[in-house]
């Protein structure tokens, strides 16, 4: 392992009925609150009324930013920054999934920065201060509820970056599985693809002596693979929703990658795709990840083989390690497809036309690190993976 320091100050409040904890949690930060949410599903399922009721009963003055996009955009962040400054906001509360939380992180950091907020999100500068914020999670997927990272898209320039800082951890996150009951099947699938991808990207590294971390990765993956088909048959099953909700948090709260840094090439490539084509993030991952695996397989065949044997039932008799690994990759792609995820860029009507642009965007992100830590990739490599994904 490499030396490491683990820091995660987020208070995780998990379980049925835990929304009541909001009463005491937000008040220590102030009563002038900006409520941030997405397209309105929290109004349809009653969560909006519950949250605003609690806030107002506890004396909060509630302002709102609604309409956060699935790939949150700079323009929406800037609108939120303006609201915070106009109303002298003390505290932000994100009610939604990863996109809402990512947008809230960006607003919280942007308010405290005197320059162009895009400087932070494009990693020209690091956020050194942020307004306090908490989350009420409604979707198991990104892990943003318990990490400092955020992804913001600049639609004007076709740029999309992952950024983060020690000041952008949520102060608390409330996770009640019942708040995920109304998540539709396709979004449930995307969430599970996303969390599995997070685990893969932490697993693929070149650091020696990480047996415990490897086994923790296997445990999360095995749990999602076992639970996913059952959940899709019973979307309001509390125990199944509970399991997936917790898996999504563990997949990206830093627990799995203590002592090394993984390879985030697939996420970087997908961010480039969805910076040009406004597609679901996890849909892009389901397409790209198996092809990244096939492309980088020879870097460490044994590591691929070990992963696949810990996920799927594969008959190894008479097969080479590479054949076993390739069969596992095929099984992964088939598993995601069986859940309803896409398998080709053509499923989103994406062809050859803008692959050069996408590869250029991905190559620019390489400059910021986190790209190719398992196998170094260049623009030509990215193009090859994209073309294999058509």
From Swiss-Prot:
CDD domains: BDH. Coiled coil: none annotated. It is an enzyme of class 1 (oxidoreductase). Keywords: NAD, Oxidoreductase. GO terms for biological process: 1-butanol biosynthetic process. Pathway: Alcohol metabolism; butanol biosynthesis. It holds the Pfam family Fe-ADH. InterPro entries: ADH_Fe/GldA, ADH_Fe_C, ADH_Fe_CS, BDH-like. GO terms for cellular component: cytosol. PANTHER family: ALCOHOL DEHYDROGENASE YQHD. This is Probable NADH-dependent butanol dehydrogenase 2.
């Amino acid at each position: 392992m490499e030396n490491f320091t683990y820091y995660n100050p987020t208070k995780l409040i998990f379980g049925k009925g835990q929304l009541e904890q909001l009463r005491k949690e937000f008040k220590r930060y102030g009563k002038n609150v900006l409520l941030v949410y997405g397209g309105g599903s929290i109004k349809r399922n009653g969560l909006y009324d519950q949250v605003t009721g609690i806030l107002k009963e506890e004396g909060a003055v509630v302002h709102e930013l609604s309409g956060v996009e699935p790939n949150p955009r700079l323009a929406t962040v800037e609108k939120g920054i303006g609201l915070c400054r106009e109303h002298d906001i003390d505290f932000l509360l994100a009610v939604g999934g990863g996109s809402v939380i990512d947008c809230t992180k960006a607003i919280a950091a942007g308010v405290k920065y005197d320059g162009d907020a895009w400087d932070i999100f494009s990693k020209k500068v690091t956020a050194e201060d942020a307004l306090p914020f908490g989350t009420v999670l409604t979707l198991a997927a990104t892990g943003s509820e318990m990490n400092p990272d955020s992804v913001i898209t600049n639609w004007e320039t076709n740029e999309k970056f992952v950024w983060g800082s020690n000041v952008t951890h949520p102060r608390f996150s409330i996770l009640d599985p019942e708040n995920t009951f109304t998540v539709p099947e396709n979004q449930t699938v995307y969430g599970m693809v996303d969390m599995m991808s997070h685990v893969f990207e932490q697993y693929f590294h070149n650091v020696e002596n990480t047996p415990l971390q490897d086994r923790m990765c296997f445990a999360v993956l095995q749990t999602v693979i076992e639970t996913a088909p059952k959940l899709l048959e019973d979307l309001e099953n509390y125990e199944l929703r509970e399991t997936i909700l917790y898996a999504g948090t563990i997949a990206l709260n830093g627990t799995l990658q203590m002592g090394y840094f993984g390879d985030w090439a697939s996420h970087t490539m997908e961010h480039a795709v969805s910076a040009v084509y406004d597609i679901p993030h996890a849909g892009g991952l389901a397409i790209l990840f198996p092809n990244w695996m096939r492309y980088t397989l020879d870097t460490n065949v044994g590591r691929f083989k070990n992963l696949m044997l810990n996920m799927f039932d594969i008959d190894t008799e008479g097969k080479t390690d590479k054949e076993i690994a390739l069969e596992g990759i095929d099984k992964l792609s088939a598993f995601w497809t069986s859940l309803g995820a896409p398998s080709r860029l053509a499923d989103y009507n994406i062809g050859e036309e803008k692959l050069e642009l996408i590869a250029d965007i991905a190559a620019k992100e390489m400059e910021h690190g986190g790209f190719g830590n398992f196998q170094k990739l260049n623009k030509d490599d990215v193009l090859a993976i994209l073309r294999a994904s058509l």
